[in-house]
Amino acid sequence: MAAELDARAAGARRLVDKVCIVTGGGQGIGRATARRLGQEGGRIVVADRVDASATQTVAELRDHGVEATKVLVDLSTFAGAQDLMAQAREAYGRIDVLVNNVSGTIWIKPFHLYTAEEVELELQRSLMPTLWCCLAVLPIMMEQTSGSIVNVGSQSTRGLYRLPYATSKGGILALTKVMAMEYGRYGIRVNTMAPGGTDIPDRVTPRQFLRPGVMADDGDPAAAEQYRREMADDIRNQQALRRRGLPEEQAAAIAFLASDDASFITGQVINCSGGQS
C-alpha cells in the first residue's frame, strides 16, 4: 500500500482470508487492486514479470500487515499461467479470487499502419494472459466449487486508433460472458471491470504514440507527447465527469466484483469510466 490507505475503504473487510491473485500487480490498476484487496483482508499473490515492481508492491502490502507474496512469471504462455496457479495453491492451499489485469496498449495509430508482428504483440500482451490464466485456474476453482474471476476490460472497444488492443479487450468481454454461463454451476463467477481513461503515474510499460498518418519510422518524441496530450484531452471530453480516473477508483470496482457483495452478479461488465461515451 502507498503511504496512505484508501480512506474510502475504511472498515471494509469483505475479503478476509481470501486468496487473491492480481496479475500485473506491479503497477497502475494492478498495484492499486492489490492494495485494496489486501486492505480488505485478502491474502495477496502479486504476479508480474518485473521483479522490482512486484517487490515494491509486496513490500508496501507487508508494511501494512497484509500477507503477500510475489510470483515472477511471463503470462503470455499457458505454461506461465499454470506455474502461477501452482505456486499460489502451494503457498495458500486454494485460490478464491483471480484478477486478470495484465494488458496495455503498445501502439496507438490507425490500423493500416500496424505491421503483422505488431498486431501479434498486441494480442499477446492484452488477450492471451487473461485467456491462459482463466484456463489454468478453472480446474482449481471447479474442485473448490467456488471462485471469483474479475477481468479488466476497456472502453477501447468503441474507440479509435487501437484496433488490435480493442480486439483483445472485445475478446475478454466474450470470454467473460461465455465462462460465466459455462461455469456458474461450479459456483464460479466471472465479471469484467472496464475502465475509461485512467492516470497511471507509476506506469513502467512503454507506449508508442504516433499521430495518425505518421509512419512508425518517423517517430518524433515531442510529437508523440503532444499527441498523447491531445488524446487525453479528447478522452476527458467524452467523460461525463470531465476528468480521468484514478487506479484506486478502478480497484474499488474490482474489489466489489471480487467480494461476496457481488455474490449474485456474474457475466457482467461494470464500466468504471466517469460516464465515458
Give residue ranges: language-model regions.
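Catalytic Tyr-X3-Lys loop
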Residues: H112-L131, S146, V150, I172, ...
